[in-house]
Amino acid sequence: MQSEAHRENVPAEILRRSIGNDRVHSSYLFTGTGQLPATTAQVFARALVCRNADRGEVCESCDACHRSYEDPEGTPIVLDGKGKRGPTHRHIGDHPDLLWVERGDGDTRITIGQIRDIQIALRLGANEGGRRVAVISGAEWMNPQAQNALLRLLEEPPSDTSLILVASRASAIIATIRSRSVRIRFEDESAVGLRDSETPAEVAEIVQVLDDLRGQSVGQLLDFAEQYRGARATAAEGVTELIDVCAEWLRMEVKDRVGRGETPTTRSLDAHRSLQQLRRDLVQRNANPQMVAERLLLGLRDAVA
């Protein structure tokens, strides 16, 4: 697997190397949190159909650039994973060869139907004689069936097509897809301090519970986890944030222990592995968000006891 490190001008670097050297790949995997990976994917996709991108940059003057432009203040078309209340994918701007896929409104997954629709669209070839590009944003929300369907496309990619996957973590994508993709890593844009003036209120509330884990009863932790019941799409987003905060809190806890000359306990290391497994259960196995939150909090309580 080829790899690139994130730098501030990463879109230009990627395109200079890929387009300038005529080595555009069939699959890319952008990983990192925050908006930058998805924004970069959109810029990259637009540049791949730009008529004047020999320097690896979108010219913004050719017809392709005009058609692929999206007003930042505009409202994107709402998708539906089942294709009943809306389309399964949309175009970037109104360019027919730039496709964008993400979870549908209220959906908990990127569905296998959405991936199959993208397969069909990519195999049809470009409408305007250049490349056809598909971006899958939030690719970590594909379940194993959708990922396996995508793998079949990558095993025999149509000519002059590129697929750009955007995921918060590479580990959420199966190894056989990762091995066929050029990896682009981004720094964590959304990371915030757990205890500073810019910490969001919902994060501060979680940290307060974690800081007092040793004093929390099982009942209190179960009561806290009850907030993650309800509509699964919303609850899953909340538990994803809970997992992120817990992972950072645990990392700092272990770091503090090492700084005091203590050896991290086996239970702390096991808790870190459990965090990753719970993340996979939530995303790939459709686990109940409230139950994931309960297992997470009770497991951390045991780890620091």
Identify the meaning behind each predicted range.
Residues I120, R152, S179:
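Conserved adenine-binding aromatic site and its adjacent loop/helix in ATP-hydrolyzing domains
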Residues M1-R55, A64-R67, E156-A305:
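Charged, glycine-rich active-site and insertion segments that engage polyanionic ligands
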Residues Q145, L153, T176:
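Residues that scaffold the ATP/ADP-binding catalytic core of kinase and kinase-like folds
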Residues R123, N148-S162:
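Conserved catalytic/switch belt of AAA+ P-loop NTPases
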Residues M1-Q145:
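Clamp-loader machinery-focused feature within the broader ASCE/P-loop NTPase space
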